[in-house]
């Protein structure tokens, strides 16, 4: 994703590994401040998940993978590290999946950094595929609505629900995005709007309760994330999804 800084626009990810440390955007500071924090031990990485420094299931998974990477590099007890990281967010399936994935990879003798980077890249590749498939749904001049944050901040880079929006914008299409504020944590107002602003994508923040009004008034497409998808296609998303 792009981020506007004092030194110009730069490409960043929500979380990555650099020089022996896990580096991430402190999402608690957005949209007022773009701050990067870094950690050199798995305990602090787990705390960054608990205190919502990092958010979004895929980004949480990647953060957990990098936490296990640190544990392996430092020679920590991997079983103890896995249990500690899993306890950081007991309801996050991606966290458990990432920890188990890294445990299996490390037991097979994989390089810790390469294994964690590969896990994060898999998330990005899936997001890019979502963008390719979803971009044709956004027509020239469309009005699009989204809720919560299913963008690059939540998925290491690119995003799920925001992937087609990014792809359409990069392809030169002109459209408008309604971003519902997403109470009580305000992820739409604080995170999704920030991401769109960095890309200069036209948008407006609306109250959650106004979603019905704007849908009646001519929204062409609603793109959402999905916390869970049932076999019959039903899905669950953030509270306030209309």
Where are these regions (language model features)?
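Active-site histidine-anchored catalytic micro-motif
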Residues: 112, 123-130, 155-179, 186-190
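A glycine- and small-aliphatic-rich helix-loop capping segment at beta-alpha/alpha-beta transitions
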Residues: 66-76, 101-105, 159-172, 195, ...
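Long amphipathic alpha-helical segments
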Residues: 13-107
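Glycine-rich phosphate/diphosphate-binding loops that line cofactor/substrate pockets in enzymes
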Residues: 134-145, 168-172
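Short beta-strand segments
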Residues: 25, 63, 67, 145-149, ...
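Small/polar-residue-rich loop-to-helix segments that shape phosphate-bearing ligand pockets
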Residues: 98-141
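Conserved phosphate- and dinucleotide-binding cores of soluble alpha/beta proteins
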Residues: 174-175, 180-242
